[in-house]
Amino acid sequence: MTKSELIERIVTHQGLLSSKDVELAIKTMLEQMSQCLATGDRIEIRGFGSFSLHYRAPRVGRNPKTGQSVSLDGKFVPHFKPGKELRDRVNEEEEGEL
């Protein structure tokens, strides 16, 4: 699902909200979450999951075109850990499809 598809779904389910209002709310929420992670903070949405940063250590990679070894610096990458309610819901729906 893309951001625009999410906006359309919310507008469809919540008839009182305009598309522009939903778009602004989602953009604001995502911007705030990005800023929070950029400062090293953790985000927890109970029942859904948590977002945090994990450190990826420096390593030697490979250029896929040339096969040449390349030194990659260490960096922080965003990480999502689903909450129990989300995991349970996904598993219930998955079992229903089988």
Swiss-Prot record:
Cross-referenced Pfam families: Bac_DNA_binding
Function per UniProt: This protein is one of the two subunits of integration host factor, a specific DNA-binding protein that functions in genetic recombination as well as in transcriptional and translational control.
Gene3D superfamilies in the record: IHF-like DNA-binding proteins (4.10.520.10)
Quaternary structure (record): Heterodimer of an alpha and a beta chain.
Protein name as catalogued: Integration host factor subunit beta
Protein's GO biological process: DNA recombination; regulation of DNA-templated transcription; regulation of translation
Family: Belongs to the bacterial histone-like protein family.
Regions crossing the membrane: none
A GO cellular component entry from the record: cytosol
Superkingdom classification of source: Bacteria
GO molecular function: DNA binding; structural constituent of chromatin
Keyword Transit peptide annotated: no
Keywords: DNA recombination, DNA-binding, Transcription, Transcription regulation, Translation regulation
Disulfide bond is among the record's keywords: no
NCBIfam families: hip, PRK00199.1
Gene: ihfB
HAMAP family: IHF_beta
Disulfide cross-links: none
